């Protein structure tokens, strides 16, 4: 039965659960690799001496105090029962061998294709639990199933999200917290592009690109930071990471591509500002600025890919075919190839592994864009 005090304080018993689960994970699933699964069913198995039961309380801080005291007393419960909210099953897994990514809970938006799919694949290979979030749920489910098949059941989960819609973003993060107990890494990757000059660009397209590439990063950070803050409060050894997949167009303006470049420039401003705000919670915020991923659908889609869009928009002087556009862009890269998901994943791994950089925009462009 839901307790009215939780509804008054947290909006709902489920909202309270989303605030409690990260604390339970931080205190009792030590080492960073553990999970906590929530169920609204309040009953805890009879005779389970390891279960921690918290009765009627005045609010969330009293629950936090009870959890903290139990941890200080050496309790290691397999389940935590909070009256009026539900039960939290604790799975305190040992850290997997490898990098700091091993055993962490990672969220990749736009994870069903392109860079996002490749990033999800690399994170899973590094031992992370990966939430593949995308507007296209069916495609996200295919990616998650492939990751489970490659790395074992429970490696990945698919969830639907519209990153430009606040209600959808809040529901996504809450769903992750209730299923896994928290969140360690956000890779804000979802993005769109509409090429065109001043006369071709419509206000509708400009606002759409801005909503997905700029506003959505604010929304994702706002809600993803919440469980990270709670985890950091109760586990002094835990850090969180937020990584925006930006672009080389966030470092240098792009001809007849101002909607995209403007949002990416703004994204770096958000990265720097969020980094200053969240550092006290041990949350690092950085951006990766990849070069062009020519093999991905953003560029190669035969109907709406950038090669086609740029050809139609006349971005490449004298270009008559898609191959002409391709050759033009590859010639700009000193390493003579496009950026791959593996290149980006290595940069993400660096962001997570290192402990002294935040607010940075890291070029991964094959030498095309160099810091000045």
Per-region residue spans from a language model:
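Active-site loop immediately N-terminal to the catalytic Tyr-X3-Lys motif
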Residues: 199, 252-258, 280, 336
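Active-site helix of classical SDR
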Residues: 221, 263, 271
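Alpha-helical segment proximal to the catalytic Tyr-Lys
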Residues: 226, 276-277
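C-terminal substrate-recognition "lid" of short-chain dehydrogenase/reductases
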Residues: 337-364, 369
């Amino acid at each position: 039965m839901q307790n009215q005090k939780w509804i008054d304080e947290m909006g709902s018993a489920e909202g309270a659960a989303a605030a409690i689960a990260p604390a339970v994970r931080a205190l009792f699933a030590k080492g960073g690799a553990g999970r906590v699964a929530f169920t609204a069913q309040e009953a805890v198995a009879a005779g389970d001496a390891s279960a921690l039961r918290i009765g009627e309380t005045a609010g969330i801080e009293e629950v936090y105090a009870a959890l903290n005291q139990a941890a200080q007393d050496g309790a290691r419960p397999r389940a935590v029962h909070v009256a009026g909210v539900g039960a939290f099953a604790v799975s305190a897994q040992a850290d997997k061998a490898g990098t700091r990514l091993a055993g962490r809970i990672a969220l990749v938006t736009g994870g069903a294709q392109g860079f996002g799919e490749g990033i999800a694949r690399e994170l899973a290979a590094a031992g992370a639990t990966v939430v593949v979030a995308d507007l296209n749920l069916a495609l996200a489910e295919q990616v998650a199933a492939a990751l489970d098949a490659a790395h074992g059941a429970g490696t990945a989960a698919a969830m639907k999200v519209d990153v430009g819609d606040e209600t959808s973003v809040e529901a996504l993060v809450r769903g992750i917290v209730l299923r896994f107990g928290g969140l360690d890494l956000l890779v804000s990757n979802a993005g769109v592009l509409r090429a065109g000059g001043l006369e071709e660009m419509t206000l509708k397209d400009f606002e759409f690109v801005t909503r997905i590439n700029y506003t959505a990063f604010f929304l994702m950070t706002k809600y993803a930071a919440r469980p990270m803050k709670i985890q950091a409060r109760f586990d002094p050894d835990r850090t969180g990471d937020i990584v925006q997949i930006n672009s080389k167009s966030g470092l240098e303006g792009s001809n007849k591509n101002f909607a995209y470049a403007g949002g990416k420039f703004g994204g770096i401003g958000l990265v720097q500002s969020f980094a200053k705000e969240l550092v006290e919670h041990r949350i690092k915020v950085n951006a990766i600025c990849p070069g062009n991923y020519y093999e991905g659908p953003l560029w190669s889609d035969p109907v709406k890919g950038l090669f086609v869009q740029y050809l139609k928009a006349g971005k490449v002087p004298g270009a008559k075919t898609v191959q002409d556009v391709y050759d033009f862009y590859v010639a700009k890269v000193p390493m003579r190839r496009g950026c791959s998901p593996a290149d980006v994943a290595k940069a993400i791994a660096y962001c997570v592994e290192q402990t002294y950089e935040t607010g940075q925009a890291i070029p991964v462009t094959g030498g095309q864009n160099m810091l000045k």
